[in-house]
Every structure is written in C-alpha cells, then in structure tokens.
Amino acid sequence: MTHEFTESYDVIVIGAGHAGVEASLATSRMGCKTLLATINLDMLAFMPCNPSIGGSAKGIVVREIDALGGEMSKNIDKTYIQMKMLNTGKGPAVRALRAQADKSLYAREMKHTVEKQANLTLRQTMIDDILVEDGRVVGVLTATGQKFAAKAVVVTTGTALRGEIILGELKYSSGPNNSLASVTLADNLKKLGLEIGRFKTGTPPRVKASSINYDQTEIQPGDDKPNHFSFMSKDADYLKDQIPCWLTYTNQTSHDIINQNLYRAPMFSGIVKGVGPRYCPSIEDKIVRFADKERHQLFLEPEGRDTEEVYVQGLSTSLPEDVQKDLIHSIKGLEKAEMMRTGYAIEYDIVLPHQLRATLETKLISGLFTAGQTNGTSGYEEAAGQGLIAGINAALKVQGKPELILKRSDAYIGVMIDDLVTKGTLEPYRLLTSRAEYRLILRHDNADMRLTEIGRDIGLVDDERWKAFEIKKNQFDNELKRLNSIKLKPVKATNDRVQELGFKPLTDAMTAKEFMRRPEIDYATAVSFVGPAAEDLDAKIIELLETEIKYEGYIRKALDQVAKMKRMEEKRIPANIDWDAIDSIATEARQKFKKINPETIGQASRISGVNPADISILMIYLEGNGKAHRKY
C-alpha cells in the first residue's frame, strides 16, 4: 500500500508522559528528527498519582538515567520541595534518594525543556494507528486522518491505552486524571498481532491542607545534608526551605467503614477486571489481606508549594465518594479534612512484554518500540528508564548503529528490562532491590562510574558533564592507588595513636586501604595517619572510596559472578532456531523457549520453569551446530 505522508520524521514518540519525554529527548539529542505526539500538551510529564520521584531502587534508576544523559534527574533537582535519603541505617546497596516534587512545576519545567530542544517537534494530536509495511514501521495515522512517516515509532501511552476510570459503581472511558483515553490505537495494536493484557492501578484522595489538623500527626522532615539526583547538581543549590510531610494512621473505625462497604467496592464487586499492583495495593485490599493489622501508615504529602492539595499516600481506593469521605474523617488529623479530589482506579491495556527484545523493540514489527506502563510496569522512574533505552535504541536503529542492551550487572534499568522480556509480568511490575542479584555493584553512589562512558559513546553526555566525570574518576582512582601504596607499620608511635582512638593496635604492617577495611576506620581517620590527598576531595568521592574499600571482598565476589554470567550472555542463540528439533528438553522449557525466544544462553537460563538440565541440552545442541539431539 502506498501512503501519502504530510510530514516525515526519523522517530515518532506516542505519549508525553515520563517514558515519552525521555525517549523523545534522547532521539532528538542523538540527531534524529523527532515528533512527540500527545493527547494533551498540558499533561506533559504530569504526575497523575504520587507527587514524588525516587524511593527504594527507583532512586537508583533516576541516578542511572542521569549518568546516561537523561532528564528526569535534572528536572526533579530543580523542582523538589523535600529531599530524603532512605535506608541510611542499612548497607550501601539499598540506600536511595526520594524527593517530594512540586508536581505542577515539575511538569512546566519539563515542558520548557522539551519545547526548546533542537530536532524535536511537540504536537497535541491523537495517534490512532501504526502504519506497517512488510513487517516494519513506516509511520502513524492521526485521528484527523493525517499520515506522518517515520523510520521508528516508540509507543509510550501509559494508562491511556483503552483506559477506564472506576469510582464506586461508576465506570467510564478515560485516561489518567480524566484525560482522553486512546481506544482506537489499542484496537489497532491488537490487530497488528501484538498480545494485549489488562492491568489496573489506582490513586488516593487529595485533601485540603488548611483543613488538616497537623497537631494530630507526626512531622516527616527532609534531610539537612545536601543530596541530589543529578551528578551535575551543586551542594550550594540544595533547597534549605523544604516542606515537610506528615504521618498518620488508619484505625479500627477506618477498617470498619471499609469492611461494611466492601460490597460497594469495585475491587470485590467484579467491576474491576484488570490485575492490580502487588506492592501498592488499595486500602480496601490491604484491610482484607492483612486483617490482623490494627493500623496502616498514611503519609500526607504536599503536591506543591503553591497548592492546597495534599496526597494521602497509602489510601489508594476506588470506593464510592461518600465512603471515601467517611473514611478520611475517621483518620486522626483528618477529622475535618476537605476532600478536594476523590481516589479512583484505572484499568488499561498493556503490551505483554515477553514480545519485546532487550532493546524494547517488538519482535513482531521492526522499528516499533514500547516503553513505560505500556509494557506493564508501574512508577514514573521505571517508565523514564525504559523510555530512555527505547529512545536510544530507536535512534541507533535509524542511524544503522549497534544497539544498546544494558545487562543485569550494568544497571537496575537492565534488571528491569531483562525481567520484563525474559519472565514477563502478571501484574504491574515494580522495581525492588531484591530483584537485583548484583545490587552491591548497582549502588546509588556509583551510577556515574557505571554508565557515564556508555552515555558518552552514544552521544547523550555533553563535554561539560564528561569533563566533570573524568576529573572525579581520576581523583577517585588516584586516591585509591595512593591508599593502597602507603604502609602503616606496627611501631609504638602508630599503635599509641590507634589505642588513643579506642581501636585495636596493629600487629602487622598494612596499607592505608587495608586499615580502612576495619569497620571503625573511616576515611578521615585513615588520612590522619597517612596524610591527605594531593587535592581536596569532594564528600561524594570520599563516600565512594569508603564503600568500595570496606565492601571490596563482597564486590569482588559479585564481579566474579558477573564474569561467569557474561560468558553465558555471549553465547548467542540463532533467531531462527527450531525448538522442536532439540530432543530431550522438558515440555515446559520448550513451551517457554517458543514463547520468549531467548537471544542468549544467559537469558534462556533465567526463564522461569527452565532447569539447568534444559540449558545443558541446549548448549550441547548449539555447540554441535544444531546436529546433536536433533529429531530425525
């Protein structure tokens, strides 16, 4: 079929949420003429649910986005109202930043960034169809009948894809926050042959700040110590006038109200059909599943500096409006609270992610990429990370360059994408530190060391950032080398000082680096014995040195595991392999291999239901050039 195109682009991104913004900025910055199409320009980078960025594992993803040259990190550093480092009492592997955002300012700042970006056209329009010829993308069709040509298309439609809002017995077609739903595109994605799933998520009510009795709640302030998501942000710019959050709880009265109205809850009446998020359940779901709990935490989170709206985190619900009011008034501090917006549930279509390659390109259609909640994830950060990778790979494909695949040992983004394309997901996927087997090397403090060179190679890290990174890396490397070269000897003068500080004396000579491995010895103590570095070191470099030195043994073990897995990842599986020709593998393994079509032995080994014996047979088959274990 010959199409008459009115406009032509290298890449078209459908949807301007957190995934779409990162995808379009990446493609345009890599030199591709890009169109970012959105149903509503006023909702670009909008936060329809929680007004925050970061959190456990998620905060590390934002740092990874920054190291690769993405935008979310810089934007939240410009627009937060509170910053907090989580899990400071635990090990470095699980520490992560979380920021409360001024949600309106966040969206405005990101829109301004997109508007001034070269090579990027921003357009309010509804995309109804993906145009495909001979198994590859050639463009898109708008609701008004316009056809735009494209060499690659990235679908980042979020919860708008056949979205339906549910509130009590009310159910109607809608995207998030009462925006338009994308129904025709959902129909046409299915017609293209993609397998579609149905998920559900929800949001809590918002209450008016001036109607809250804060004296009945517990204050939750931000941190005084400067922290940032972007490695380029300066401590001098750290916000001093932060806005606190507040903590309160549900109680038995709250639980009674919910239990008495379960028959009216869409979650239990059968109105909700989609699968909801395990790690962010509705309050009615929590009350039923954890009936033994006397109370549940609720955080009152301001939505911005210039608004009265307060987000009641932990109270996600689709109960009828009258029940929501009663529920709110049962909570300490909210007895007279004015509900400004009701909570609601939203159901939406997803593209089942086992149909994707690790580049986030669909296996079915060349040049068609998907990212974000479209792939079955939850969260702004997960969406932004996928959007960045999808955008990068769309640009690389258009330019005929090698693709970028982040491994599980490279980044949490790599863990997430590998989980999605290898295991799929039966519920909205959320990143957790427990999902990463190499979390000690995927830390908050070393994201730039892991990924900045990759960002530079693909063209997203500019000269200023690259110079700053080189300076930091050289300072780190030089100081590590110095600490490993200076010896402390167990002489009287040294041991007298050691014992004065309350530490065990030295029995053997050791390097300053070995001295620092002692749990009680920090960098400042070590250099008091061996002298300072040639130049003043930033506190973040010192933190990195302490972590790398104190956990060196564990880090080395993790790197050994990475090297072992790398050998399996390098063993490619032919795309046209005949799984039925391999004798002796288990039926379940054969079915999973056919469904997912893994690209490497490493990926095959991570598929649920596949055991080591199946992998051994597969490797023997491949090593025999397809002759061993072939059926005749």
UniProtKB/Swiss-Prot annotation:
<feature type="binding site">
    <location>
        <position position="373"/>
    </location>
    <ligand>
        <name>FAD</name>
    </ligand>
</feature>
<dbReference type="GO" id="GO:0005829">
    <property type="term" value="C:cytosol"/>
</dbReference>
<keyword id="KW-0963">Cytoplasm</keyword>
<dbReference type="InterPro" id="IPR004416">
    <property type="entry name" value="MnmG"/>
</dbReference>
<feature type="binding site">
    <location>
        <position position="182"/>
    </location>
    <ligand>
        <name>FAD</name>
    </ligand>
</feature>
<feature type="binding site">
    <location>
        <begin position="276"/>
        <end position="290"/>
    </location>
    <ligand>
        <name>NAD(+)</name>
    </ligand>
</feature>
<dbReference type="InterPro" id="IPR026904">
    <property type="entry name" value="MnmG_C"/>
</dbReference>
<dbReference type="InterPro" id="IPR040131">
    <property type="entry name" value="MnmG_N"/>
</dbReference>
<keyword id="KW-0819">tRNA processing</keyword>
<dbReference type="Pfam" id="PF21680">
    <property type="entry name" value="GIDA_C_1st"/>
</dbReference>
<dbReference type="InterPro" id="IPR044920">
    <property type="entry name" value="MnmG_C_subdom_sf"/>
</dbReference>
<dbReference type="InterPro" id="IPR020595">
    <property type="entry name" value="MnmG-rel_CS"/>
</dbReference>
<feature type="binding site">
    <location>
        <position position="127"/>
    </location>
    <ligand>
        <name>FAD</name>
    </ligand>
</feature>
<dbReference type="InterPro" id="IPR036188">
    <property type="entry name" value="FAD/NAD-bd_sf"/>
</dbReference>
<dbReference type="GO" id="GO:0050660">
    <property type="term" value="F:flavin adenine dinucleotide binding"/>
</dbReference>
<dbReference type="Pfam" id="PF01134">
    <property type="entry name" value="GIDA"/>
</dbReference>
<comment type="similarity">
    <text>Belongs to the MnmG family.</text>
</comment>
<dbReference type="InterPro" id="IPR002218">
    <property type="entry name" value="MnmG-rel"/>
</dbReference>
<dbReference type="InterPro" id="IPR049312">
    <property type="entry name" value="GIDA_C_N"/>
</dbReference>
<comment type="subunit">
    <text>Homodimer. Heterotetramer of two MnmE and two MnmG subunits.</text>
</comment>
<dbReference type="GO" id="GO:0030488">
    <property type="term" value="P:tRNA methylation"/>
</dbReference>
<keyword id="KW-0274">FAD</keyword>
<protein>
    <recommendedName>
        <fullName>tRNA uridine 5-carboxymethylaminomethyl modification enzyme MnmG</fullName>
    </recommendedName>
</protein>
<comment type="function">
    <text>NAD-binding protein involved in the addition of a carboxymethylaminomethyl (cmnm) group at the wobble position (U34) of certain tRNAs, forming tRNA-cmnm(5)s(2)U34.</text>
</comment>
<feature type="binding site">
    <location>
        <begin position="15"/>
        <end position="20"/>
    </location>
    <ligand>
        <name>FAD</name>
    </ligand>
</feature>
<keyword id="KW-0285">Flavoprotein</keyword>
<dbReference type="Pfam" id="PF13932">
    <property type="entry name" value="SAM_GIDA_C"/>
</dbReference>
<keyword id="KW-0520">NAD</keyword>
<dbReference type="InterPro" id="IPR047001">
    <property type="entry name" value="MnmG_C_subdom"/>
</dbReference>
<dbReference type="GO" id="GO:0002098">
    <property type="term" value="P:tRNA wobble uridine modification"/>
</dbReference>
